[in-house]
């Protein structure tokens, strides 16, 4: 993996399009302002969007694939400060461009596991899910919309606004009432297509071959819209409510 360095701020539209304009990050948490030229600029809330922009703008996609990059950078989100969540934080990340096989997903997960092991961080467990692809996700989205519509009066204002545009985001809401409703929502693994199922099973086989234990958690969707197929989180039981210490996934 080669180091990549990206600006601390980007055009706001980059995050609106990639992270998703119905996510908490874009709706509530970004630090956004207009520069002297009247352009909307945002401090980066995460590292992937800027890395992908740089990958495309600087022609890395014209070089031999896969391209593997890593970064360590500061990010900014207007969150309620608490254990494990500060408004300025550092994110270490890796991106693997141009690798479509399940082995690439397992490689990234294995790298994270090795990093934690080398740092002596214990008591983490890996949770894994697939959120499907553009081919199969519309059926799941329709099922979610039907389910949450029957609870619309109970949802928070933000989730009601997401009901028509992106009901999957409701699964990521931290409101206790919305979380309780989401607990009984349809699960995505009942809707994924055969190709996504094969990919997900392949990731599991590679992790088993590497000796990496995991549990399937069909409720993981991550908080950003660009993910497809594999999503994962490393979770700790030792740091309180905000238990996810590492997360990621595929974005085809």
What are these regions (language model features)?
Residues 1-252:
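TRNA-recognition modules of translation machinery and tRNA-sensing kinases, especially anticodon-binding
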């Amino acid at each position: 993996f080669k180091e990549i360095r990206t600006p601390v701020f980007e055009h706001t539209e980059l995050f609106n399009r990639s992270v998703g304009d119905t996510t908490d990050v874009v709706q509530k948490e970004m630090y956004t302002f207009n520069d002297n030229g009247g352009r909307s600029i945002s401090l980066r809330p995460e590292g992937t969007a800027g890395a992908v922009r740089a990958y495309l703008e600087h022609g890395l996609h014209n070089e031999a694939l896969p391209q593997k990059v890593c970064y360590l950078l500061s990010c900014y989100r207007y969150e309620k400060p608490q254990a494990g969540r500060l408004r300025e934080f550092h994110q270490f990340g890796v991106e693997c461009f141009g690798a479509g096989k399940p082995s690439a997903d397992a490689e990234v997960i294995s790298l994270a596991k090795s990093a934690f092991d080398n740092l002596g961080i214990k008591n983490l467990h890996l949770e894994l899910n697939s959120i499907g692809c553009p081919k199969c996700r519309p059926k799941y989205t329709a099922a979610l919309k039907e389910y949450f519509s029957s609870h619309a009066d109970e949802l928070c204002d933000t989730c009601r606004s997401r009901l028509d545009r992106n009901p999957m985001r409701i699964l990521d809401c931290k409101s206790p009432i919305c979380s309780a409703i989401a607990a009984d929502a349809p699960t995505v693994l009942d809707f994924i297509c055969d190709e996504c199922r094969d990919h997900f099973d392949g990731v599991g086989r590679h992790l088993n071959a590497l000796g990496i234990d995991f549990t399937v958690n069909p409720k993981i969707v991550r908080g950003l819209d660009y993910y497809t197929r594999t999503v994962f989180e490393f979770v700790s039981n030792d740091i309180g409510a905000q238990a996810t210490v590492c997360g990621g996934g595929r974005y085809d």
